[in-house]
Amino acid sequence: MYKRQIIDDTLSLRDAHCPGAKVSVLSNATQLHRDGVRRALRSVDNNILKLDSAFDATARLINNPQSPVYSVRRVVDQMKGFDGHLTVQTMFLRGEFDRQRVDNTTEEEVAAWLRLIGEIRPRQVMVYSLDRDTPCRTLEKVPREELQAIATRVEALGIPCSVA
């Protein structure tokens, strides 16, 4: 089914049965280059888009995007087109995956990610870490204190940030 139709049907059901309810959509943001996807996401109350790293190599390790032309820059440029009407959600983690070190909590990673958050200017940021078992036992949950320190840096940009 066409994604826009799913969103339209959801909004119609909400309007008919629970008009006060908010509709939220969490997207991995890899299809933001598609006009229909952007239009559909603009129509919901809470458009939550993933951005787990400022670097293509790290994003590929964490998210395994299937498109060979995937780039963080392309995703960020599309996010900027929402003019702040979005929430950015980021999962912080570290460990080893597929014999490669992955860690989006280093100063280099966090500083670059913060620069992108400053460019995007979302209405809110959500940061979290692993909360359940993963298929890869070598990945580690980031302590809440570290997540809170990252959130404080986001808030210094004038953007509200929640820690889960």
For every predicted segment, state its role.
Residues 143-164:
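Binuclear metal-ion centers of metallo-dependent hydrolases, dominated by the metallo-beta-lactamase
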